[in-house]
Amino acid sequence: MEEPQSDLSIELPLSQETFSDLWKLLPPNNVLSTLPSSDSIEELFLSENVTGWLEDSGGALQGVAAAAASTAEDPVTETPAPVASAPATPWPLSSSVPSYKTYQGDYGFRLGFLHSGTAKSVTCTYSPSLNKLFCQLAKTCPVQLWVNSTPPPGTRVRAMAIYKKLQYMTEVVRRCPHHERSSEGDSLAPPQHLIRVEGNLHAEYLDDKQTFRHSVVVPYEPPEVGSDCTTIHYNYMCNSSCMGGMNRRPILTIITLEDPSGNLLGRNSFEVRICACPGRDRRTEEKNFQKKGEPCPELPPKSAKRALPTNTSSSPPPKKKTLDGEYFTLKIRGHERFKMFQELNEALELKDAQASKGSEDNGAHSSYLKSKKGQSASRLKKLMIKREGPDSD
């Protein structure tokens, strides 16, 4: 088959002269249906309105560019937005350490606790020998307030927690981050407060602006009819072993009796351990306390060192020599030598018997051995007499 020859008469519109012809071939409904002439184009770009608009636009653009350049060279200082205050340090240090010494005052203020055992099911128990309260997390801990005479009206009771050891006393006792974010507990109390009061709508949770310490204050109520003391129910909202919180550091709870002006009327304190099994921990610590024989735990932390046992010595105690219970057979040639070794063995047996047995047994045994020894001595004399005589054939 013959290939069709290309039509050379068709030329591509490669010049500006053919562009107007192609423009006329476009359909009439096209947006660009009419091609403007060269005169109209010149009038468009050379009209006074367009020229003024371009000049105004150019001036505006130049002004914007100049403003941008000046801004880049000399930045304008904007008024900063109010910055939020920095959060408080996780462990704020207090400027003063409250005292925890017992002070009964003029009203004979003292504390009391309910008698409870050491069973596994108990949720709160107090050890008088340790002056320590063992309780579970967020469980009711009744504390009794005893006074000899009624304080003045408006008296308040304050509860505050501090660390027991000297190196941590300046730190504020607060809950761990995990329990702070939890929604459990009283909504009236701040989430960072460790001690809370149960069943008292007049409780006030205070943060000291100078020491940053947390405390809860309730008005003092006289004992009810038929009762000798006032009871306040406290809750501890974090475990002693929580990381980021107490972190196994022992704490003390200070209960103070104050007048309306804040003057101290009485003070008392006790150690607290918040754990999962209060009864078990109380038994363990009381046994350790009895074994160590430490002084009273109410003494200052400086004297809380472990006392060395008095019976310690560098050299071990001498060991008693134990008699060997084995028996051996010794072959001896000659009857005379046998008698001599027999007497020596009996003498050693007598010495051992005197060292091990009492005087009564030793007396009977020695008399028996002496009689036997006397018989052996007489036999030895007879043998010597026979040897002194003439030899027989």
Curated annotation (Swiss-Prot):
Cofactor: Zn(2+)
Stretches the record annotates as Interaction with USP7: 359-363
N6-lactoyllysine: modified positions: K120, K139
Site keyed Interaction with DNA: positions: K120
Region (Interaction with HIPK2): 319-360
Ranges spanned by the short sequence motif Bipartite nuclear localization signal, renumbered to the chain: 305-321
Effect of substituting L133Q: In cell line V79-4
Residues with Symmetric dimethylarginine modification: R337
Region (Interaction with AXIN1): 116-292
Biased composition (Polar residues): 364-378
One Pfam family per UniProt: P53_TAD
Effect of C135W: In cell line V79-4
Gene3D superfamilies, per database record: 2.60.40.720, 6.10.50.20, p53-like tetramerisation domain
Superkingdom to which the source organism belongs: Eukaryota
Location relative to the cell: Cytoplasm; Nucleus; Nucleus, PML body; Endoplasmic reticulum
Renumbered ranges of motif Nuclear export signal: 339-350
Region Required for interaction with FBXO42, annotated ranges: 113-236
Stretch list, region Interaction with E4F1: 256-294
Region named Interaction with WWOX: 66-110
Region (Interaction with HIPK1): 100-370
Disorder noted: p53 is found in increased amounts in a wide variety of transformed cells. p53 is frequently mutated or inactivated in many types of cancer.
Subunit text: Forms homodimers and homotetramers. Binds DNA as a homotetramer. Interacts with AXIN1. Probably part of a complex consisting of TP53, HIPK2 and AXIN1. Interacts with histone acetyltransferases EP300 and methyltransferases HRMT1L2 and CARM1, and recruits them to promoters. Interacts (via C-terminus) with TAF1; when TAF1 is part of the TFIID complex. Interacts with ING4; this interaction may be indirect. Found in a complex with CABLES1 and TP73. Interacts with HIPK1, HIPK2, and TP53INP1. Interacts with WWOX. Interacts with USP7 and SYVN1. Interacts with HSP90AB1.
Record family assignment: Belongs to the p53 family.
Protein known as: Cellular tumor antigen p53
Classification of source organism: Eukaryota, Metazoa, Chordata, Craniata, Vertebrata
Gene that encodes it: TP53
